[in-house]
A protein has these predicted regions:
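Mid-to-C-terminal alpha-helical segments outside catalytic/metal-binding sites
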Residues: 8-9, 17, 27-28, 51, ...
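Histidine/acidic residue-rich metal-binding segments in metalloenzymes
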Residues: 1-57, 71-82
Length: 130
């Protein structure tokens, strides 16, 4: 779904549009972006008027959410921490509530403080003008 969206020209036509792919896994999302870039090159899309690669469109306008696993956060090195939003997943049964803070601390144990702040709240504050 993400690859198809990135190849659809929607982001080219609406460069101020911001898109959040919620309920997604960062690992799965990274694959979709890599696939979109591969497909773009294989199909010769740059010669058809595409001005940016799908991964560049994603970096400019899109976000993924993450919420539970440390493995996904390793993918931030590929995606860039500026495009990741943390979700508590509340009120779903898979939410770490009422131990949300402890869960976040465990999830972000290997993440540098600046990136942790960015993912946990700064990206959302910027995106939603809070």
């Amino acid at each position: 779904m993400v690859a198809n969206f990135l190849l659809s020209r929607v982001l080219d036509r609406f460069p101020k549009l911001k898109v959040v792919f919620a309920e997604s896994s960062l690992g799965w999302g990274a694959y979709e972006i890599e696939y979109a870039d591969y497909q773009s090159d294989a199909d010769g899309l740059p010669s058809e008027g595409y001005t940016l690669k799908p991964s560049e469109l994603f970096q400019r306008q899109c976000y993924f959410t993450c919420w539970y696993d440390r493995m996904s956060l390793r993918v931030r090195r590929y995606l860039g921490s500026a495009n990741i939003l943390w979700s508590s997943h509340f009120p779903l049964a898979t939410s770490p509530w009422p131990n949300t803070r402890q869960h976040a601390d465990l999830s972000f144990v290997d993440v540098p403080e600046q990136e942790k702040r960015r993912i946990l709240w700064e990206n959302a504050a910027k995106l939603y003008s809070l």
